[in-house]
Amino acid sequence: MLKIAVLVSGGGTNLQAIIDSIADGRITDTEIKVVISNNPKAKALERAAKAGIEAVCISPKQYADRELFNDALLEAVNVRGVDLVVLAGFMVVVPEKMIKAYRNRMINIHPSLIPSFCGTGYYGLHVHEAALKRGVKISGATVHFVDEGTDTGPIIMQKPVEVRPDDTPEVLQRRIMEQAEWQIMPKVIDLIAHD
């Protein structure tokens, strides 16, 4: 049984895709042990609680300095004995000691086809604004292992999505979530569960 922690900062739509995929059997032999958010108002915490999953808020604002926050975040994952850490819209820089502790056991979803529109500053709608400004015809999503760089870890899976001439950043974001992110993240977790 693969035990996972899902780290998320906002609405938790990728978290919901994972929860639903476990419920309907697209992800097997996997249990979400905890959902951790840095944002006490994150809807993801509600989604977790509704699904009967432990939901924890660990915010940098709760700690005197960043090192104390980093230690608390790592400890929160460690004490739950997880095998895989899933970053599903986690808008906090992951501590280097956590990356080292979970080397090749931490994955992230990014809303573009890496190496395009990734790295520092490319998150949320910024990614889709950049894609539209550049005039690309295809965008998509990538699941990758996390390393010390920003969106630089080894790619596990990608899925392309058509960019339409009348797209707005919001419309493109939604299409990439529905057609790519919510599909490939569950597939990758299931692959890892059976590796």
Where do the language-model regions lie?
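One-carbon transfer enzymes
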Residues: M1-D195
